[in-house]
Amino acid sequence: MNVALTKQELHNLAMNHVGKDLEKRGFEFIAINSKLKKHPQFVCIDKNSQYFFVIVRVVILPENPNNYDVVWMETFKKHALENDAKVLYAGVGLGNPEGEDLPIYLNKEYLIEYNGIQFIETNLN
């Protein structure tokens, strides 16, 4: 029986992909938050002890995972500046290979669109 992934499970799947990418890039995890709509998902530091707030956003394909709410991001950038952190954005698109109207199922193949981490300039607009 096919069991469709919940929004939280889709979010966790996206976070797993991004977390592996962050590890490969040499980031050290300070905090991880996997709750939906709770930001940032990752607080990391690099080898120079610079803090990074990482936002992970999952969308269902064909929606573009690289797009984000610019107005909301301004508020988040302010939060990062107050904490001497830089902002990274990771958009992840997931889809069912058998059709974009079908859900993504547990333990089944899925499509992924992930173009890596985007550095978000923290200068306020």
Regions found by a protein language model. Give the residues of each.
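Acidic-basic catalytic patches of nuclease active cores, encompassing PD-(D/E)XK
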Residues: 1-32
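Short loop/turn and capping residues at structural boundaries
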Residues: 33-34, 91
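Short beta-strand-loop-alpha-helix junction that forms the active-site gateway
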Residues: 54-67
